[in-house]
């Protein structure tokens, strides 16, 4: 039973065993940066909504009939809170996915990420080889001494 569990753990997170610690730290820092920026965006949206409503509501009440600004205010309030909550949920979802990826729990889409990373690395190697090959070719019309 213990052997089966150990084999299962090894097959579940092979990308973590091959990665150096520095690369995992960089991934974690990137995850925190991405999630943190989404959380900050969520907070700024909430603050902007509250400030806009604070400024706009009295003006709408003074210069419009009573029902129109009430409907507009309720719409703006709802839209602002929904956007703020949506950004917060998105940030938490991203942080959760990245945490599961870094701990080797294989979240949905991890295979696609690994495949894209492999393709990108192979294309980068191919472009490097082409650049080296191109730099070694003699330029037409140049004189050789």
From Swiss-Prot:
Region spans: Disordered:
123-145
Please give the tissue specificity annotation from the record for this chain: Expressed in seeds (at protein level).
- Motif: Proline-knot; annotated at 58-69
- Cited InterPro entries: Oleosin
Compositionally biased intervals (Basic and acidic residues)? 123-132
In terms of PANTHER family, this protein maps to: OLEOSIN, OLEOSIN 18.5 KDA
Family to which this protein belongs: Belongs to the oleosin family.
Q: Give the protein's biological function.
A: May have a structural role to stabilize the lipid body during desiccation of the seed by preventing coalescence of the oil. Probably interacts with both lipid and phospholipid moieties of lipid bodies. May also provide recognition signals for specific lipase anchorage in lipolysis during seedling growth.
The UniProt comment on domains reads:
The proline-knot motif may be involved in the targeting to oil bodies.
Q: This protein is called what?
A: Oleosin L
